Amino acid sequence: MIISEKKQIKMLSNAEMELIHLGACRLLSRVGVKVTHEVIAEKLISQGALRKGERITIPANMVENALEKTAKTIQFDAPDPAYSFTLNAVENRVKFGPGGQALYIVHPAAGGWGRRPAGTDDLKQILVLCNRLKNVDFITRPVECDVPEDRMDLEKARIFRQCCSKPMNLANLIKVEHLDRVLEMIGDPAHVSFIISLISSPLVLDNSAGDKFIALVEKNLPVSISCCPQGGSTAPFSEVGELLQLHAELLFGFVLGNVIRPGARLLYRGIPVTSNLYTDGSPRWCQPESIRRVALAAQLCRFYNLPCCGTAGVSDEAEPSAQVISEKVLSWVYEMAAGAQYINSALGMLEQVLSVSYQQYVIDDILLGIVKEKFGENGSLKPSQLALSAATAALSRFGVAVDEKMEAELAARIRHIENAMEPYNEEYIGEQLNLIEKAVNKTSSTVFMKTARKGLREGYLYRGDRIDAPLDLSDATGRLESILGQVN
């Protein structure tokens, strides 16, 4: 669907985004990226990068050249041509697909929910299910096959070829030497795309990912460059600092991609989440401050007319619940309103990225239909009003009587998403640049955690109440049984 200009949100001004961009370019030219992959280092140096010990620094002109050259339109073809679509960086068209690399399946058990390891049969069943869900536009690998690692790529390709008629995102490539065989098994390379986590935060090139990135870009395959720093552990706890680091890490990928192949077909996938510094440091994927930061990354990407791979709907809850519905709906609304186009991991995800649920895929498909209806309605609702309306409608759809207390909690989450807590100015950006430089030269997690105390005191991490109410899942269960029953 197309998101109208009226339904978009601009949480950063153009001037603020320009400051973040200039700061990220300073970070690349001053601190650079640790690169021990000699082939990649030489490729970058040949185009104007500089060596600084083990780090490669990137001058601003290389960044600007990459942004100018990189493909602005990417075609995603499908085995069934009816599902093919084009992503154009200047359009506000949004598509949704599942994703993740979940280890577990959450399933009904003894009046509640159980959890078991995911495997090959689950990959088949989930692909079949997503192939039939109305609001799934493309399918990203949700779980891995339970086969030896040296067979994973080929088994995954075989199952996708057998079960998927929509555009396929195979996500990661386990063995780069399998790429030619994978493409042969798929049948048409135009049907597939990939995701690469190229940089380990803060600012270190992953050598294995670098090999795979070269192979994929040389074949002109679409690649989402994914970066998921955690504010407070692998990036500054500051929103401004985390965006600076994230943007620099992703820009490095665009520079490298266009050195390998000018006009490379790359998507910007920024997932700047926070760490739960109140407990175990785990990522807070779908809490208000993370929803805000991920939406800001999408807005920053679209400001530079780059194809945007978004991430939304990755609930922190372990099983289907009213809280899950609330987290997912707010996450989708703000990622859509901020300009994300190719929204990955949007369905089925629970317990951060550890689990998926067959029931949750169907629930999410229904919920996405509600959210799309809200975006499609006439009128001039602000994103905050649209988000509240969508969340209450979604909860009501599954039998939750939304009361004043629930509405107040939803409104508080929305305010936390929309309200900035830090200045976007040159002085503050300079402080964050110095912090990142200090972190890359020392133990980064220690540096970032020590400086997180101020943000904790000021409430960067949202601490509200869970939305707790029983759900009526009879319709979702019936739909699931109908779909899987028809194909089994």
Model-derived features with residue positions:
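A glycine-rich phosphate-binding loop feature that marks nucleotide/adenosyl-phosphate handling sites
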Residues: I40-S46, G270-N276, A312-P320, L350-L354, ...
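Short beta-alpha connecting loops at secondary-structure transitions
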Residues: E5-I9, T279-W285, G313-P320, G348-Q360
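Short acidic (Asp/Glu) and glycine-rich catalytic loops that position anionic groups and cofactors
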Residues: M1-S4, I45-G48, K52, Q230, ...
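Generic secondary-structure signature for well-ordered alpha-helical cores
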Residues: C25-V33, I45-L50, E68, K72-Q75, ...
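Helix-rich catalytic cores of soluble enzyme domains
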Residues: G114-A337, Q341
